[in-house]
Amino acid sequence: MLGVAAMVGGVHASVACTGISLTATDGSYIQARTIEWAYGPLKSEYVIIPRGQELQSYTPTGMNGLRFKARYGVVGLAVVEREFIAEGINEAGLSAGLFFFPRYGSYEGYDSAHNDHTLADLQVVQWMLTQCATIDEVKAAVERVRIVGLEKTAVVHWRIGDPTGRQVVIDSRW
């Protein structure tokens, strides 16, 4: 019987992430997540972005996309590059995370004529958390940018939550 269980429930690589949110009986609210990435090391590191820091987005042709200044301080967990925050929170209590979205999403085609408002998919969390304090601000802000994928990156989508428990998921179907 144990052999059958091992064959049926065998070990396999996982690339799924799970996001949860909980509200306690006292009304306090928390968001959490897992990161399961079987394709190799993500070179994860904690990052701190102070309010006022000047930032710029990558595009498929280099670091020549949207320029922005942090309105809010941010702490987060970056993967691969310091700019690619997978999960973070800002000083206003807004939290955001990116989640793998294979086979379901797609991005706008890259057009260098729009670099001044082009944002790399893996920098959306960094940008949202440095610019927005509420879900309503996030919804308005995403209408003003063009999100593009970087070469060799997976399509992702984003989960954003504020301290009141409001949440939104932004899919990458543009």
Task: Go through each PLM region and give its residues.
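A short structural micro-motif
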Residues: 7, 144-149
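Alpha/propeptide regions of enzymes that mature by internal proteolysis
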Residues: 23, 114-146
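Bacterial N-terminal signal peptides
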Residues: 1-10
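Surface-exposed patches in mature extracellular/periplasmic domains of secreted proteins
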Residues: 139, 150-158
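Extended amphipathic alpha-helical segments with heptad-repeat/coiled-coil character used for oligomerization
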Residues: 155-174
